[in-house]
Amino acid sequence: MLKLFVKYTSIGVLNTLIHWVVFGVCIYAAHTSQALANFTGFVVAVSFSFFANARFTFKASTTAMRYMYYVGFMGILSVIVGWAADKCSLPPIVTLITFSAISLVCGFVYSKFIVFRDAK
């Protein structure tokens, strides 16, 4: 399980970079809310994360159903974190760090035991 988590984390580093860049563009160039910026960053990064983790971490096939489960769960998580950040007036960097930490742990557990549970 540790080996899988290390692989998942490695892909997560790239995923986080993608997410943060898109988030920054939304906040500072497009002047969106944190909820929208976080969700947009997520949408761009989640596809990379799903396909990379399916192939390299879990060695599983990609199906539309698996994709919908993954995107749905992570999308809800993204919106909740962004909404809470807006309500608490958190600085954008705190939102990014918070979502990155929560999504790493929750995303791994959800991927391993729900999305890719049948993967060999």
Curated annotation (Swiss-Prot):
Name of the protein described by the UniProt record: Bactoprenol-linked glucose translocase
InterPro entries tied to this protein: Glc_translocase_bactprenl-link (IPR016480), GtrA_CellWall_Glycosyl (IPR051401), GtrA_DPMS_TM (IPR007267)
Described function: Involved in O antigen modification. Involved in the translocation of bactoprenol-linked glucose across the cytoplasmic membrane.
Keywords on record: Membrane, Transmembrane, Transmembrane helix, Transport
Subcellular location: Membrane
The keyword Transcription is annotated on this UniProt entry: no
UniProt record similarity statement: Belongs to the GtrA family.
Gene: gtrA
